[in-house]
Amino acid sequence: MPKKDRAQEAPSRDVPKPEEGQTICVVKKMLGGDHLVVLCMDGKERLARIPGKIRKKMWMREGDVVLVGIWDFQPNRCDILYKYGNDEIKRLVNENIISREVIDQLRG
């Protein structure tokens, strides 16, 4: 007897939102190794580092939207904390955390 067709729903996860010392950025250039140049919402270009625990799990490309944690002692450097997917970017736009124009402008 065949199984009944069940509606497949993707589990909805909470989208990480920027907290104190964090900002949303767009990957501008890959430098090699685990370093990237990112353009942040505050208009600054920062040198970002992919930490070891997410280096092999999360592949980066130019134009990806990421959440970064800014270093306290060097504000022009940061660590990648999370990479947003397309559906998560739409959810951020719907919640008015970031505007679509800003994303389009940062992606250039």
Curated annotation (Swiss-Prot):
According to the entry, every stretch annotated as the S1-like domain falls at: 11-85
Is Protein biosynthesis among this UniProt entry's keywords?
A: yes
Q: Which Pfam families match?
A: eIF-1a
Alphabetically ordered keywords of this record: Initiation factor, Protein biosynthesis
Among SUPFAM superfamilies, the record links this protein to: Nucleic acid-binding proteins
Keyword check for Protein biosynthesis, yes or no.
yes
Top-rank taxon of the source lineage equals: Archaea
Which GO MF terms does the UniProt record name? RNA binding; translation initiation factor activity
Q: Which PANTHER family match?
A: EIF-1A
List the HAMAP family hit by this protein, alphabetically: aIF_1A
Family annotation (NCBIfam families):
eIF-1A, PRK04012.1-1, PRK04012.1-3, PRK04012.1-5
Q: What does this protein do?
A: Seems to be required for maximal rate of protein biosynthesis. Enhances ribosome dissociation into subunits and stabilizes the binding of the initiator Met-tRNA(I) to 40 S ribosomal subunits.
Q: Which family does it belong to?
A: Belongs to the eIF-1A family.
Listed name of the protein: Translation initiation factor 1A
Q: Which organism's genome codes for this protein?
A: Saccharolobus islandicus (strain L.S.2.15 / Lassen #1)
Specify the taxonomic lineage: Archaea, Thermoproteota, Thermoprotei, Sulfolobales, Sulfolobaceae
